[in-house]
Amino acid sequence: MTDYTTYLGFRHLEKLYTASSLSFDCETTGLKPQVGGLRLLQFASAARKIVVVVDLFAASEEELAQLDLFFTNGDRFWLAHNAVFDLGWLQAYGWHPRGEVRCTMLASKILTNGMPNLKHGLAPVAKRYLGIDVSKEEQRSDWSGELTEAQIRYAAKDVEIL
């Protein structure tokens, strides 16, 4: 897998503004919007080998408005793992990606329909189809505090794999 360049901050969304296809992921402080917060949004372009990570806890109102324009600009192809989870969070914040959304978790379930004892989280799917080992150790870390380098690397890698 080719290494992507990772950028942190809203100003870097412009690097992806015209991309026709993007992977996206969310890092949250809870499993549901009613009991947690949306901490990070990560976007990746395979064509451009770029990942952009934005920290919503540090966002201004202007930057949040920028996200609405970003999600509705053009007619993109969006790819996520467990898209139902991610889209639920986006919709809770009033963001509705324009275009087609595809889910690698659902694709894995369809491809392995009827095969017992298979898991469909990102780590087992990446191992099964890409031969890549993915550490999910940071997934359970505290996303409500100051972000660590390890958390940012984890968030970027999750969306890069897609």
Model-identified regions with their sequence ranges:
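Conserved Rossmann-like nucleotide-cofactor binding loop
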Residues: 29
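N-terminal accessory regions of nucleic-acid-interacting proteins
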Residues: 1-26, 34, 60-63
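N-terminal G-site helix/loop of the GST-like fold
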Residues: 18-20, 39-42
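Active-site-proximal helix-loop-helix substrate-binding element of RNase H-like nuclease domains
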Residues: 32, 36, 42-161
